[in-house]
Amino acid sequence: MDVRLTSEQRQLRDAAAKLAGELGPGSVLDLADARRRIRLEDAVAGTGFRELRSDGASGVEVAIVAEEFARGLVDVPFLGPVLADDLQGRLDGDTARWTVAHRGVAIDASGCDRVLKLEDSGVFAGPVGDEVAGADLTRAAGAAAGPWEPRADISARHRDRWPALALTTTCADLVGAARGAQRLAVEYAKVRSQYGNTIGSYQAIGHLLAESEALIEGSISVLWHAAWAVDELEPEQALRAARIAKIYAARAARTVCETAIQVHGGIGNTWECLAHVYLRRVLVSTELFPVRLEEAGLGLS
């Protein structure tokens, strides 16, 4: 495994980061800005990021975009559509907007009208129902109750590999959200003064942020191994790598987000502080394709 990104992958990362930085929400108030979201939706649709897999992109490329979008709190669909694209590809003449279902819910479903679910016997399609209330302020969910109809044949190998991609993509979302929350906390610690000094100069705050940074670096390591494994290892090995990454990244991201709230002090518990938006996204991404320790062979024997 070569951990270095290629020049094309670095360009992809920079493009995704620029898009998220320019059009993503910079404040909680921006989440209600419909015109901004329309511009963001048009920009994401124009990039073709949602069709990465049918364009031949690897799991690494999908993870790159997912991570940068989560870091910038991009609040238009990516996760659901890119996973749906991997299941069925780009069909000629199909104008529907697709996402995927998990436990009876169409995830990341804003603007989507059709949903796919993967079963042992194949891929099935159904309508996206009414919006389902959720904690995530950046992604909507819809009901996925059917009726279902067979949509596409899928090989056993692809069927076994897709869960690894789904886990890895949600893991990338967790890592990106953790990075965003950490950036928010560090920037605040640099400017918030107490007792004549910025709070970041005090060991109590500095050590908290250093621990968060270490957790993020560990998450990045397991994420990139899992993303590489999606296409390079056998499905069973790829799935195990993805499960391990998801377990580690989920716990790390929650800790990082909670630390970011703590660093902000009283303002961290207010609606206006973006820290809770990152935490909400992390909590929801953790429950998308969740993993137990026993499934990764990490439980107590």
In which residue ranges do the predicted regions lie?
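FAD-binding core of flavoproteins
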Residues: L73-E187
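Amphipathic, small/basic residue-rich leader segments at the start of a protein or domain
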Residues: M1-G72, L300-S301
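Glycine-rich phosphate/cofactor-binding loops in nucleotide/flavin-utilizing enzymes
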Residues: G266-S301
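Residue-level recognition of alpha-helical structural elements
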Residues: L5-E8, L12, D33-R36, T198, ...
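Amphipathic alpha-helices that form helix-helix packing interfaces
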Residues: L19, C171, A185, S212, ...
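C-terminal helix-coil-helix/basic helical segment that borders enzyme active sites and/or dimer interfaces
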Residues: G24-D33, R53, V186, I216-I247, ...
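Extended amphipathic alpha-helical segments enriched in small hydrophobics
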Residues: R13, T169-E232
